[in-house]
Amino acid sequence: MTFNKRQVKINHWPEKNDKEKQKYSKNRETVKLTLLTLLLLCSICFLFLTLNFPFTIEFTASIPRTCDHNFTVYVYDLPKEFNIGLLQNCRHLNIYTNMCPHVANNGLGQPLHRGRTSWFSTHQFIAEMIFHARVENHPCRTYEPDTADIFYVPFYGGLYASSVFREQNLTKRDELAVRLVNYISGQRWWKRSNGRDHFLAIGRTAWDFMRSSDTDFGANMLMQMPRVMNMSVLTVERQPWNGDNHFGIPYPSYFHPYTSAEMVTWQDKMKNVERPNLFSFVGGPRKGLEKAAIRDELIKQCAESSHCELLKCENGGSRCHNPMTVLGVMARSRFCLQAPGDSFTRRSTFDAMLAGCIPVFFSPHTMYTQYMWYLPDDKRSYSVFMDEKNNTHIEQELLRISENEVVQMREIVIDLIPRLTYAHPNSTNYDLPDAVDIALEALAKQARDNVVVSL
């Protein structure tokens, strides 16, 4: 196989007579000045509101679809303090960044193109908002709780957790989660199975909700509460050893199609794009972490290889925050290296698969123990695993994989794209199961198999 660095580009007022002009000139100037002042004030107010409260929570109903799944889901209408009320403080929902642009458009973020678009600059920790918007418009939603198979509790727990991450008063850090659990466990429908048919969807990792009594790393105790342990908790990263009620859902990427045709067009494009690079790495080094060593090694090997494209992310580098730049690197590559980041999992994995790039993992907890609802049982069919302890020469190992194997693996990766993608909440003519459909189907099956109802 030959590889090179060739780039692939994926009305005016009518005038009055002189007498009228003279008579009203002074008044007219006063009116003009007043109007201009009002216009300026309105513009300033509009700009302020746009920058500070740009979110839209408009669960606009799409064209009605038939429920093609064998389940119904009930959505609790929670007090606003548990979800959309949090967005009023969007500038302070994250200690590192202003989240106002990111909570716009029901969590999809800012559009990457003008007009109606399916591409957005979506924040990696915003899945809970997108999930909420999708379920609100889901064809299998029921407004009759007595007919529901599963019950969705739309708590924006991730956004709340990140807003109080540095709160030293642990009681205050936990208080909203505690109020939520007290509220939901007091509902009639909780009592029919003690919450075992209820679920949360959280956009952050499970570690942010598992503070024990003797440790404090910024987390709250939501997932440690006994009543929550009865529920199913969907999260972008589960605790892989003891999180029996944790279920991994994909990190949101940038593509949220309105129609099935858009998805199929994208898949065809990824099947046919030229991939001049054997492999690539998008990421930066880590300090003070066990995972730092493998990251440093990946950066080193990629930088030294003529077959690897490196997009190094340091000090919040803007290129790494440009979705099209990131996807461009991945679409030019056959394999994409996926080292653990601050935790085991990475949004980059889902960006890579969206770009049709075969992921290479160095820890089983980056993918294999996380997203079982979404992936084939045969891990080797869509990915490569290299144990980080084996000091593997990455380029040599990847070159051992035959061209036919690469083609087959890439086809499976591209076939997986729809189920790893969050369709647009207002999608129309979209009949491919997306990330939300997959999760709801699995939750309903689990409830039917395991829940004993008593009222």
Swiss-Prot record:
Q: Which domain of life is it from?
A: Eukaryota
Chief location of this protein within or outside the cell: Golgi
The record's keywords, sorted A to Z, are: Glycoprotein, Glycosyltransferase, Golgi apparatus, Membrane, Signal-anchor, Transferase, Transmembrane, Transmembrane helix
Q: Which residues lie on this side of the membrane: Cytoplasmic?
A: 1-34
EC code(s) of this entry: 2.4.1.-
rRNA-binding: present as a keyword of the record? no
Which compartments is it annotated to reside in? Golgi apparatus membrane
Q: Which GO terms describe its cellular component?
A: Golgi membrane
Q: Which residues are noted as glycosylation sites?
A: N70, N169, N230, N390, N426
Described by its record, this protein's role is as follows:
Functions in xyloglucan synthesis by adding side chains to the xylosylated glucan backbone. Involved in the galactosylation of hemicellulose xyloglucan.
Write the protein's name: Probable xyloglucan galactosyltransferase GT17
Starting at the broadest rank, the lineage of the source organism is: Eukaryota, Viridiplantae, Streptophyta, Embryophyta, Tracheophyta
